Amino acid sequence: NSELINSILGLPKVMNEA
C-alpha cells in the first residue's frame, strides 16, 4: 500500500516541520 509507505517515509518530515 503506497499510503503505508508514505506514512512511514513522511513521518520524519512531519517531525522535522513540528
From Swiss-Prot:
Its main location: secreted. It comes from the Eukaryota. One of its GO terms (biological process) is chemical synaptic transmission. GO terms for molecular function: hormone activity. InterPro entries: Pigment_DH. GO terms for cellular component: extracellular region; synapse. Keywords: Amidation, Hormone, Neurotransmitter, Secreted. Pfam families: Pigment_DH. The modification Alanine amide is found at A18. It is found in: Secreted. Causes the migration of the distal retinal pigment into the proximal end of the pigment chromatophore cells and thus decreases the amount of light entering the retinulas. May also function as a neurotransmitter and/or neuromodulator. Belongs to the arthropod PDH family. This is Pigment-dispersing hormone. It comes from Procambarus clarkii. The lineage of its organism: Eukaryota, Metazoa, Ecdysozoa, Arthropoda, Crustacea.
